[in-house]
């Protein structure tokens, strides 16, 4: 394994100072979970310097999380198994220390951070750790952590009233109040909108640079790694491949891609233009491309015609609908000027699958007031459409999906699916028409095997040829070898495929997916995206709620932008990302390739790196 050279480590501490020692030292570590026949961690040797900002990357199943759980003793003290080798944190052998003892040295924010919030108010949550450790200064620690993360104004809020980004910062403050030497954050941006994701990383950088805390993130988003990390550990098959400074790691972007971590578009495109070292951000990439970019794309074709071999996207993809014209419902009132719609030939509209008319919905606050989430919503969802719901955390995406399933009914207005008013049928009956796949896939596994979970609905409905249908779906989602495994034991990508199988087994007209690509490596993400693209043969209409703007750019035929309880814009992906005033208003961040293209002033706007390469000379591409 290649390691970070001494010149890239933080400045050395004075001679004899314990701070000169690495904060984490892993030696010949192997670990095997009970009931498995192979080691999850294999002969790991790793050193992390005090004060570093480390990104641990690798494909799903590469043991990133298992490795990091050895740092705070969860492995082997909670997740037991065959443990060999040693892990020292701040000079302490984790084998000889309890998880409680280690928690004051290593703070851990889990991927599912909501499960860490155990107290009713923000102040109580952040004070919980230092108070239970008996620290007399627990009030000072609490106030300090809240101030450092910029959430002191939330101290008296109930945790269930917070947005996803705010909840994540509270979980981080709770571990920060113990003043650890190390903070580990598992998938810090997986469930956040792009603007809040960046805020989390900015806060982590402050803690690292201002307070000297060693920060370790487990991450799939290489764009954040390139901008914020100092060093990168690439994991594969249970062991580090290398540990390198971030610039060297990005220069070896082929290594990253080979292990399921795609290089940021800034890296890949600047490398194609011959930049050495590669660019790590949008301005640097635009500067590298500007001297070679052409005045128009190579082989420019009429709108809608793709270059040979280019992957179809949006409305061009199989089953995609004609692009919807721009409809700004509240944009002018909100200060967003609508873009002029291109003239389109009149066409027979596709059959309506679901409608919402005058829909208003909200939730009661603790104080008893009604907090409106959706207000006077009118929508038609049509056959053949692939719809992306986008907006900030709390914009109402999940509420809209639950209304379509009948899990909740609107406080005013009507929702119909296949002509059925959801107020007149139970959610169980509506499941014959609409399937909803949860944001957290593990919540959908009720049985002991994937096969049983997929067969639960068709067997329960006594569907003819249920067994044959189940076997076909298992093959379609690529889980034949894992069909007899418990779904909860699968990797993130495998769980997503399994839940997609559960949804397809219901044979719905309308398929709803909540954040289907969150926490997935590039291979798993591409697998899920490809399966979504193939849904036209099985599902009449698919709706995805997502913060993944790459998925929006490559999959969607129609984008509904939710903001303050209304549809702010109803547009195609290209129209959305071509309008900086709209994305800024809704705190959306276009894919990195589109942002580079905006810097270069390219028109029509490329949405992906593949599209942007068409603007480069053939010898550069």
Predicted regions and their residues:
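Helix-to-loop junction immediately C-terminal to a conserved catalytic motif
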Residues: 72, 405
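Conserved ABC ATPase "signature" C-loop
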Residues: 237-238, 565
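Catalytic Walker B motif of ABC-type/P-loop ATPase nucleotide-binding domains
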Residues: 183-186, 511-514
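ABC ATPase nucleotide-binding domains
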Residues: 256-352, 582-621
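Conserved ABC ATPase "signature" region
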Residues: 137-154, 354, 464-482
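Conserved ABC ATPase signature
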Residues: 158-162, 166, 486-490
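Conserved ABC transporter NBD signature motif
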Residues: 80-92, 413-421, 430
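ABC ATPase C-loop
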Residues: 176, 503-504
């Amino acid at each position: 394994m290649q390691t970070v050279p001494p010149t890239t480590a933080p400045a050395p501490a004075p001679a004899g100072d314990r701070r000169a020692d690495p904060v984490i030292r892993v030696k010949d570590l192997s670990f095997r979970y009970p009931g498995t026949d192979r080691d999850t961690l294999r002969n790991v040797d790793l050193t992390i310097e005090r004060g570093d900002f480390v990104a641990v990357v690798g494909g799903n199943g590469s043991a990133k999380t298992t490795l990091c759980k050895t740092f705070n003793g969860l492995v082997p003290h909670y997740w037991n198994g065959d443990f060999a080798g040693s892990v020292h944190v701040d000079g302490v052998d984790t084998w000889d220390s309890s998880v409680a003892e280690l928690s004051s040295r290593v703070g851990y924010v889990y991927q599912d951070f909501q499960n860490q919030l155990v107290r009713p108010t923000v102040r109580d949550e952040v004070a919980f750790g230092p108070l239970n450790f008996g620290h007399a200064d627990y009030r000072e620690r609490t106030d300090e952590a809240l101030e450092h993360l910029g959430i002191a104004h939330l101290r008296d809020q109930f945790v269930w009233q917070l947005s996803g980004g705010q909840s994540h910062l509270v979980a981080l403050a709770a571990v920060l109040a113990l003043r650890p030497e190390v903070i580990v954050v598992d998938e810090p941006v997986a469930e956040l909108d792009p603007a809040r994701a960046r805020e989390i990383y900015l806060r982590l950088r402050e803690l690292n640079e201002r307070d000297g805390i060693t920060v370790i993130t487990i991450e799939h988003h290489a764009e954040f790694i390139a901008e914020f990390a100092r060093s990168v550990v690439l994991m594969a098959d249970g062991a580090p491949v290398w540990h390198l400074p971030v610039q060297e790691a990005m220069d070896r972007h082929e290594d990253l891609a080979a292990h399921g971590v795609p290089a940021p578009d800034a890296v890949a495109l600047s490398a194609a233009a011959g930049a050495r070292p590669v660019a790590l951000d949008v301005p640097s990439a635009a500067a590298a491309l500007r001297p070679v970019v052409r005045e128009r794309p190579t082989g420019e074709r009429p709108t809608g015609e793709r270059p040979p071999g280019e992957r179809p996207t949006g409305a061009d993809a199989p089953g995609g609908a004609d692009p919807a014209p721009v409809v700004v419902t509240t944009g002018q009132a909100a200060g967003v000027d609508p873009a002029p719609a291109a003239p389109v030939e009149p066409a027979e509209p596709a059959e309506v699958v679901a409608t919402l008319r005058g829909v208003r919905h909200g939730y009661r606050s603790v104080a008893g007031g009604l907090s409106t989430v959706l207000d006077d919503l009118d929508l038609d969802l049509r056959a053949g459409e692939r719809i992306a719901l986008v907006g900030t955390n709390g914009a109402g995406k999940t509420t809209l999906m639950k209304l379509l399933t009948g899990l909740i009914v609107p406080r005013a207005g009507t929702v119909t699916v296949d002509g059925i008013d959801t107020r007149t049928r139970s959610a169980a009956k509506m499941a014959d028409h609409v399937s909803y796949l949860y944001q957290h896939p593990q919540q959908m596994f009720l049985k002991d095997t994937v096969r049983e979970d997929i067969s639960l609905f068709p067997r329960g409905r006594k569907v003819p040829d249920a067994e044959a249908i189940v076997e076909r779906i298992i093959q379609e989602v690529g889980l034949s070898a894992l069909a007899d495994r418990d779904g909860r034991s699968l990797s993130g990508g495998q769980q997503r495929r399994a839940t997609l199988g559960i949804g397809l087994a219901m044979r719905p007209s309308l398929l709803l997916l909540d954040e289907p690509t969150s926490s997935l490596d590039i291979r798993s993400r591409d697998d899920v995206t490809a399966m979504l693209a193939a849904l036209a043969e099985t599902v009449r209409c698919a709706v995805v709620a997502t913060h993944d703007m790459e998925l929006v750019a490559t999959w969607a035929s129609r984008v509904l932008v939710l903001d303050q309880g209304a549809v702010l814009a109803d547009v195609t992906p290209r129209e959305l990302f071509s309008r900086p005033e709209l994305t800024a208003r809704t705190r959306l961040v276009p894919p990195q390739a589109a942002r580079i293209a905006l810097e270069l002033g390219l028109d029509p706007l490329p949405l992906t790196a593949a599209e942007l390469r068409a603007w480069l000379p053939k010898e550069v591409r």
